């Protein structure tokens, strides 16, 4: 009987204890619901003005970290266990994550996303206000470091691919130039410089037999300093030359047998033809007429130079007579038709050789008589000179 009474007393005591604990649990839940009335400050407020803890508490005071309490509610069926979040102190709120990090005037701030609040309620909190959440800050810093390493790897990979693209473009560029249209290249040849026209040497004259003439000119004759006695005589010679060419109807021969109006090409009219202009471009068709006019003037200058430096100049310097007639004949040597008779004879030694100069009176086609020497006839009318020698040659046998 005693044992039965003891068991019943134990059951009654346990039931009374369970009823009291249930009453305490319900009172605690109601009190928790009534006490949660704190809210975080607005997002636009400055980070420096946000309080770390509630009024009356120190800045370094941490929130109360109460262990999770497992409470059992007993109903019709079996008891169900529920986890209830611990109560936070006044002024403390739960952090969901860290969004960004910045440094202002040497102080580090973090953009905090609060749990249960929208993104517009995010605030920048200084590092001192987050001293109780060092684990969240450390995790965020590690994620930043890992993110920087990933970005660097991506940058290195991108820099390795870009040079290959540039190299391909560089190699492909010359190929495009080779496939371009053909380009015409014009090679411009500069005219060969002609020798000075005012330098005359009688040693450059060669007769028909290939022997050099022995006459020499000791001076260099300029274009304006011809070795003539009077300017009036020169003008007279030019006028007579024009009259002779107009009456005979013979065109001026520039490239015929190396002669120019009966004279050898001392300076050569070909130099005027080759040296068309100082430039390198070709002349147009309109400039050819000007070139022809220059050739005629060049022939005139050439005849004047030949008068000053030719073999007749030596004969004129020797003091022979009628030098005007010789000059007239020298300008048109092909018009001589007959040798009348010899006038003078002169022998000289040159290079240990005997040089004989014979002066003849010749008749031109227009009937005028002129004086010519044998050297001039050898170059221009060799057949006429040979016929004269054959007709007038006399053989005297030696005794």
UniProtKB/Swiss-Prot annotation:
**Which GO terms fall under biological process for this protein?**
heterochromatin formation
> Taking every annotated instance into account, which residue ranges of this chain make up the domain Chromo?
93-152, 332-396
**Where does this one sit in the cell?**
Nucleus
Q: What Pfam families does this protein map onto?
A: Chromo
* Superkingdom of source: Eukaryota
Q: What else is known?
A: Heterologous expression in Arabidopsis shows an additional localization at specific nucleolar compartments and a cell-type dependent subnuclear localization.
Name this protein carries in UniProt: Chromo domain protein LHP1
Which organism encodes this protein? Solanum lycopersicum
């Amino acid at each position: 009987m005693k044992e039965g009474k003891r068991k019943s007393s134990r059951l009654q005591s346990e039931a009374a204890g369970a009823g009291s604990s249930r009453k305490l649990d319900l009172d605690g839940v109601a009190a928790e619901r009534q006490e949660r009335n704190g809210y975080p400050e607005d997002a636009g407020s400055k980070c420096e003005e946000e309080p770390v803890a509630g009024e009356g508490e120190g800045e370094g005071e941490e929130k109360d970290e109460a262990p999770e309490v497992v409470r059992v509610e007993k109903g019709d069926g079996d008891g169900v266990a529920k986890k209830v979040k611990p109560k936070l102190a006044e002024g403390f709120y739960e952090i969901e994550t860290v969004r960004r990090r910045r440094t202002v005037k040497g102080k580090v701030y973090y953009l905090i996303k609060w749990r249960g609040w929208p993104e517009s309620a995010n605030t920048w909190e200084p590092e001192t206000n987050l001293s109780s959440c060092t684990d969240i800050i450390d995790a965020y810093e590690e994620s930043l470091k890992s993110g920087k390493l990933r970005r660097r790897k991506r940058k290195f990979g991108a820099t390795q691919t870009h040079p290959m693209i540039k190299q391909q473009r560089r190699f492909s560029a010359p190929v495009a130039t080779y496939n371009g249209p053909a380009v015409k290249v014009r090679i411009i040849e500069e005219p060969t410089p002609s020798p000075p026209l005012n330098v005359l040497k009688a040693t450059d004259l060669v007769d028909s037999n290939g022997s050099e003439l022995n006459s020499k000119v000791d001076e260099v004759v300029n274009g304006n300093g011809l070795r003539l006695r009077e300017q009036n005589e020169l003008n007279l010679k030019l006028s007579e030359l024009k009259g002779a060419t107009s009456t005979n109807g013979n065109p001026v021969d520039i490239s015929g047998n190396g002669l120019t109006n009966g004279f050898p090409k001392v300076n050569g009219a070909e130099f005027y033809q080759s040296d068309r202009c100082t430039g390198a471009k070709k002349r147009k068709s309109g400039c050819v007429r000007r070139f022809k006019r220059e050739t005629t003037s060049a022939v005139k200058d050439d005849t004047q130079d030949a008068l000053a430096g030719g073999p007749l100049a030596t004969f004129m310097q020797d003091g022979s007579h009628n030098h005007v007639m010789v000059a007239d004949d020298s300008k048109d040597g092909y018009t001589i038709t007959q040798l009348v008779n010899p006038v003078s004879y002169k022998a000289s030694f040159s290079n240990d050789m005997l040089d004989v100069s014979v002066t003849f009176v010749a008749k031109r086609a227009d009937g005028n008589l002129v004086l010519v020497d044998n050297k001039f006839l050898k170059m221009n009318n060799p057949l006429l000179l040979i016929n004269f020698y054959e007709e007038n040659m006399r053989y005297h046998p030696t005794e």
